[in-house]
């Protein structure tokens, strides 16, 4: 089974077979907003000023035995990311996100690891995340990554209804 989550520049949509859904569904505004931030491939720190964010260094904090550098990033939309950087390579190893979803404050934690260099860019091949404090999180492991590969924009469009 394959889960699909897409955004075409205007609206988000998904197919969630693990939740028993086989047909594409349009996302709520909050879900699409969350998807946009999660899809920001360069992360919250690259070009943070141009993105309208502010960044504050908060010192170091232990992340699973690593004394990580902790940064507080306040996004243009008011969301807050706490970004934890590995002290040796300055790669993101954890991001804690605080945002409003459906009128309630939520906090999610994402751990990144198993970095590999692809065309001069480091990609995390392991991403594990979910609500902060929950032990059963969703884990994504990548087999392959390409940098700057050509992609047909139509693959992001909401699928047409199947003909009957």
Predicted regions and their residues:
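Short, conserved active-site entrance elements at the starts or edges of catalytic domains
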Residues: 34-72, 91-96
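Short, solvent-exposed mixed-charge patches
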Residues: 163-164
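Residues at the C-termini of beta-strands that transition into short coil/loop
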Residues: 16, 59, 146
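An acidic-aromatic
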Residues: 1-37
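A broad, low-specificity signal for short, low-complexity segments enriched in glycine/proline
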Residues: 17-19, 28-35, 42-46, 85-91, ...
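Gly/Pro-enriched, hydrophobic low-complexity segments
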Residues: 1, 64-160
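Short acidic/polar alpha-helix capping motifs at helix-coil junctions
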Residues: 20-22, 44-46, 74-79
